[in-house]
């Protein structure tokens, strides 16, 4: 496998101007690395100062929020304890009212949707799912007719409506 791959990178020679162009890139990179070290160090210091400033200000803001929350809870807790016999049932009642209104609205929308579908089906339009309903109606109608025929056959067999040869034991009439 090693024989398949060239060992040196200069197998494909470049045209003279391309070789000069690419050789300049390497030299520019070396010059950038010599001068870029100071630049990257000052950039790292600027990043660190910015991060410390942003982090510190966010830490102060979160501390103020925590202190404000603790003070608000300290003030509100006695009020909540005093008014809890009134507030808890009131909140439960409000929750039940909201649940009732939302559910009745949902049921109303569902009813309007169903009535709209029935209207479209009754007027001859073909709403979505009507083909399944027609198929189920045809299957059910076929089963009803089959049961009706069987009931009529067994009713005639019990009342003696068939020929004498069919009434004997062991013979069955099939349709």
Curated annotation (Swiss-Prot):
Membrane topology label: Multi-pass membrane protein
Location in the cell reads: Lipid droplet; Membrane
Region (Hydrophobic) residue spans: 48-119
Transmembrane among keywords: yes
Q: Which intervals of the chain form a coiled coil?
A: none
Return the GO cellular component terms, semicolon-separated: membrane; monolayer-surrounded lipid storage body
Q: Does the keyword DNA-binding apply?
A: no
| Region of interest: Disordered | 151-175
| sequence repeat extents | 17-26, 27-36
Keywords, sorted A to Z:
Lipid droplet, Membrane, Repeat, Transmembrane, Transmembrane helix
Where exactly are the transmembrane stretches of this chain? 56-76, 78-98, 99-119
The family database entries (PROSITE patterns) matched by this protein are listed as: OLEOSINS (PS00811)
Q: What are the start and end residues of every segment in region (Polar)?
A: 1-47
- GO biological process, alphabetically ordered: post-embryonic development; reproductive structure development
Similarity section: Belongs to the oleosin family.
Function of this protein?
Answer: May have a structural role to stabilize the lipid body during desiccation of the seed by preventing coalescence of the oil. Probably interacts with both lipid and phospholipid moieties of lipid bodies. May also provide recognition signals for specific lipase anchorage in lipolysis during seedling growth.
Q: What is this protein called?
A: Major oleosin NAP-II
Lineage, top ranks: Eukaryota, Viridiplantae, Streptophyta, Embryophyta, Tracheophyta
């Amino acid at each position: 496998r090693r024989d398949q791959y060239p060992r040196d990178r200069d197998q494909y020679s470049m045209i003279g101007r391309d070789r000069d162009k690419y050789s300049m890139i390497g030299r520019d990179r070396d010059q950038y690395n010599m001068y870029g070290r100071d630049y990257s160090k000052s950039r790292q210091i600027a990043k660190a100062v910015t991060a410390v400033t942003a982090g510190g200000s966010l830490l102060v803001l979160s501390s103020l929020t925590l202190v404000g929350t603790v003070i608000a809870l300290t003030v509100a807790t006695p009020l909540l304890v005093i008014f809890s016999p009134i507030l808890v049932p009131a909140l439960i009642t409000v929750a039940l009212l909201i649940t009732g209104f939302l559910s009745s609205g949902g049921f109303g929308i569902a009813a309007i949707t169903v009535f709209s579908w029935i209207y479209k089906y009754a007027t001859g339009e073909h709403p979505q799912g009507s083909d399944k309903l027609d198929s189920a109606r045809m299957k059910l109608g076929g089963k009803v007719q089959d049961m009706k025929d069987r009931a009529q056959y067994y009713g005639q067999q019990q009342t003696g409506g068939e020929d004498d040869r069919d009434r004997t034991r062991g013979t069955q009439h099939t349709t």
